[in-house]
C-alpha cells in the first residue's frame, strides 16, 4: 500500500515539475504577466508539498533493514526517480529566479521572445495542480516579494536534497532499471503502428500498388528507349 501511494505521489510530482518547467520557459516572453508569476509560485509550492510527502514515505522503508531485497529494490528505484525530480525542480527554480530578476514586471521591458502567444498558461498549471481553475489574487508588488520567497525556497530544496543524501545512501548508479530507457514511448508507438498495420499492408498489396508498378515499368522502358535513340542519333551525326 505504501509503495502504491508513493507511486501516485511521484506521478503527481512529475506532472507538477513538468508544468513548472513549461511555465519557467515563458518568463520574459510575450505571454509573461503577473498571472504567470502567480501560477509559477503555486506550481512550485505544490511540487514542494508533494516532495515533502514523498520523502517521508520513502525514508522509513529504505532505513528498515528488515525489508526484503525485492521490495528494497523497488523503493530504491522510486527514490532515484524522486531525487531526479528534485534536481530538476531546483534547477528550474534557479532559472526562474534569474529570468524573473532580469525581466521585472514593474519596469518597461521588451519581451525576450516574441512567440505570438498571448495570455497565460492557466490551463496547464490548473491541470498540474489538479484544480478546475486558478484564482489570481496577487497584489501589485507580488513579483518583488516572490523573488525573495523564491530565494528562500531554493535554499530549502537544496537542504532537502542534502538531508536526503545523509539519511538514505542510495547511489544512483547502483539502481538497475526494469526496462530500457524510453521503453514506454516505444511501446506506445508500436501499439499505434500495430493498430494501423493491417490497413497499411492491405494498401501495399492492393490493386492500386499493381497499377503503380506497371506504370513505373512502362516509364522505365520508354526512358531506356529514348536514351538508346539519342545514342544512335549521336553516332550517325
From Swiss-Prot:
Keywords for the protein's UniProt record, in alphabetical order: Coiled coil, Membrane, Sensory transduction, Signal transduction inhibitor, Transmembrane, Transmembrane helix, Vision
Predominant place of localization: membrane
Superkingdom of the organism of origin: Eukaryota
Topological domain spans for side Extracellular: 235-237
Tissues in which the protein is found: Specifically expressed in the retina. Only present in photoreceptors (at protein level).
Residue intervals annotated with topology Cytoplasmic: 1-214
Alphabetical GO biological process terms: detection of light stimulus involved in visual perception; G protein-coupled receptor signaling pathway; negative regulation of signal transduction
A cellular-component GO term for this protein: photoreceptor disc membrane
Compartments, as annotated in UniProt: Membrane
Region SNARE-like, residue ranges: 153-202
Coiled-coil ranges per UniProt: 29-58, 144-169
Membership in a protein family: Belongs to the RGS7BP/RGS9BP family.
Subunit text: Specifically interacts with isoform RGS9-1 of RGS9. Component of the RGS9-1-Gbeta5 complex composed of RGS9-1, Gbeta5 (GNB5) and RGS9BP.
Annotated function: Regulator of G protein-coupled receptor (GPCR) signaling in phototransduction. Participates in the recovery phase of visual transduction via its interaction with RGS9-1 isoform. Acts as a membrane-anchor that mediates the targeting of RGS9-1 to the photoreceptor outer segment, where phototransduction takes place. Enhances the ability of RGS9-1 to stimulate G protein GTPase activity, allowing the visual signal to be terminated on the physiologically time scale. It also controls the proteolytic stability of RGS9-1, probably by protecting it from degradation.
Name under which the protein is recorded: Regulator of G-protein signaling 9-binding protein
Organism, scientific name: Bos taurus (Bovine)
